[in-house]
């Protein structure tokens, strides 16, 4: 059994802030935990514009707090998000998140991230193998 709190993750190597300071992700479960997925609490700053493309991962996102827009860049669709909204990037969609207020979300990645990934110039996490 694994039990962790965000308080014990804060300000450790599992607490990642983007280079531009727009988002912060607390990586609660990572690939090294060997459970087949990773689980993160992510906050995104109000008024920021954030483009992502998880070409190597499926991501499920549950919005806990905040409001904003999700733009599907592959299909030119705009979705209004609020507490209780969920989106699943099962088609590896390129997308943009534009928070109107600070957003706090819970995210699940498959395959799991290791915690060392950095978004490349296209917003993609590379696929990093988890050591056996």
Swiss-Prot record:
The keyword Lyase applies. CDD domains: cupin_EctC (cd06978). One of its GO terms (molecular function) is ectoine synthase activity. Transmembrane segments: none annotated. GO terms for biological process: ectoine biosynthetic process. HAMAP family: Ectoine_synth. This is L-ectoine synthase. The lineage of its organism: Bacteria, Bacillati, Actinomycetota, Actinomycetes, Mycobacteriales.
């Amino acid at each position: 059994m694994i039990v962790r709190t965000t308080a014990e993750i804060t300000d450790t190597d599992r607490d990642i802030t983007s280079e531009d300071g727009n988002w912060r992700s607390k990586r609660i479960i990572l690939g090294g935990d060997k459970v087949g997925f990773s689980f993160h609490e992510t906050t995104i700053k109000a008024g920021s514009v954030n483009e992502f493309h998880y070409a190597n991962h499926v991501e499920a996102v549950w919005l806990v707090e905040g409001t904003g827009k999700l733009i599907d860049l592959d299909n030119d669709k705009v979705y209004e998000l609020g507490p209780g909204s969920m989106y699943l990037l099962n088609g590896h969609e390129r997308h943009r998140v534009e928070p109107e207020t600070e957003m706090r979300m819970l995210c699940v990645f498959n395959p799991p991230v290791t915690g060392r990934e950095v978004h490349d110039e296209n917003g993609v996490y590379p696929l990093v193998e988890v050591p056996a």
